[in-house]
Amino acid sequence: MGFDFSLSPSKIGVLKDCPKCFYNANVLKVDRPRGIFPSLPGGVDLVMKTCFDAFRPVLPAHLVKQLPGRTLWGNKDQINKLRNWRSGLKTELKIQGKTVSLIGALDDLIVEADGTFSPFDVKTKGKQPETDGAEYYQHQMDLYSLMLFENKMQPSGNAYLDYWFPTTFTDIGDMGWGDRLFTLDTSCQRGRE
């Protein structure tokens, strides 16, 4: 199958935030300048994925009470494919007469009690979040739900954002962490828009 364009949730996010930056990167091949990228969120992300994989298919202890009746999808090899943007979720959509390849990589995937699927994403913040961050992540989660649907994995209509933030620091240098789980409603239709 051939396609006219290849997009991902992050590329679409750039389009929404800065159309000129999107044009420069994708048409003129001039990348948007990146500031210093913090390594702490990437480190937390890696630790959390390792933790989830150690429990798979059971949820890690901190989520069992918050998400009763749910499990983690797949085995370690299967989820690692979904975590890689080259082998993750892929679909082709027809938009205004053009074929668009949509690709995305998930942090994890929750299997709901009814057998439907919910994207799960780990986020980090400097303090406990006051809101779910939907203004930043809603469209990304809608696109993941659309990609699940197009890959014959029925989306549940929910996505989970698990925010991790520092809570304490001890005199011997140990840092305590807390987490706050949010549920976003998702829509395949919004993902198409």
Feature annotation, model-predicted:
Residues 27-33, 122-124, 174-178:
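Short acidic (Asp/Glu) and glycine-rich catalytic loops that position anionic groups and cofactors
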Residues 122-132:
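Short beta-strand-loop-alpha-helix junction that forms the active-site gateway
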